[in-house]
A protein has these predicted regions:
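Long alpha-helical, hydrophobic tracts
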Residues: 1-67
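Long, charge-patterned amphipathic interaction tracts in eukaryotic proteins
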Residues: 37-253
């Protein structure tokens, strides 16, 4: 991925984190995802044009990268993993999860992996900050559940809303891309489908995963509907202008 793209995405996320206006924050995050999708489309079209001269996939190889999401045994890890899979899904990255949910393995083009990590790290901070703000107001006590149960339920709702928002941003970017006038050039849908198939093929070859991830609900016995709704509300607003958002990588258990 070009440093310019990563810098543009990073600047948009920094703007989101630096504003107290929830609508501006949401717009910055959605624009970051749109830029990532537009870049992916343009890159795939360039690869398609060169298919008679180069191996499919162009000069950017498919890679596998490891990303630590938290210390072993930290309860919030499963939601950090779930958030990563949500961001990865809209950026053509496949994911394996460690048995203890302390790290993930991303499979895809390096450009996509870089964008996924940028978006994930920003949204993880957003999620933790938004939950803490509400807990500071006593919402977990009003719901009649423990702080941990409330927080994890909040994360459920938050991630659900973020997933919807990022998918919408991807769809908007694809719809807004003007069709090329070059005769014989493949459609956006076609190149993205071929890219997805290429990543899947690489994953099938490179992955040595066994079994399946148990998900964010593993080991939980209680949840809070009001907390989930609060999470959906904050996830839809993407309110990144809260205290503590600069502490990247911090997600309370």
């Amino acid at each position: 991925v070009s440093d310019r793209l990563v810098d543009r995405v990073g600047k948009l996320l920094a703007q989101a984190e630096g504003t107290d206006n929830e609508h501006e924050a949401a717009a910055f995050v959605e624009r970051a995802q749109q830029l990532a999708t537009e870049h992916a489309v343009d890159l795939e079209l360039a690869r398609a044009r060169q298919r008679d001269r180069q191996h499919r996939g162009g000069g950017e190889p498919l890679v596998q990268e490891r990303l630590a999401v938290g210390q072993r045994g930290q309860r919030g890890n499963r939601h950090r993993v779930l958030l990563y899979t949500v961001v990865a899904a809209v950026n053509d990255v496949m994911v394996n999860v460690s048995h203890d949910s302390s790290y993930v393995l991303g499979f895809g083009h390096r450009s996509d992996l870089e964008v996924v990590e940028r978006l994930w790290s920003s949204l993880a901070v957003q999620m933790a900050a938004a939950a803490q703000r509400r807990m500071d107001k006593g919402e977990h006590r009003a719901a009649g559940v423990t702080g941990l149960s409330w927080r994890l339920s909040f994360y459920d709702g938050f991630i659900d809303a973020v997933s919807t928002r990022l998918q919408r941003a991807r769809e908007v970017a694809i719809e807004q891309r003007q069709p090329s006038e070059v005769a014989g050039e493949p459609s956006t849908a076609l190149v993205l489908r071929e890219k997805s198939e290429r990543v899947q093929s690489f994953y099938d070859t490179a992955s040595d995963a066994r079994g399946s991830w148990r998900g964010a609900w593993s080991g939980r016995t209680r949840s809070s509907r009001t907390a989930r709704e609060s999470g959906r509300t904050d996830g839809a607003r993407a309110d990144l202008g809260q205290p503590g958002v600069r502490r990247r990588g911090q997600l309370p258990a």
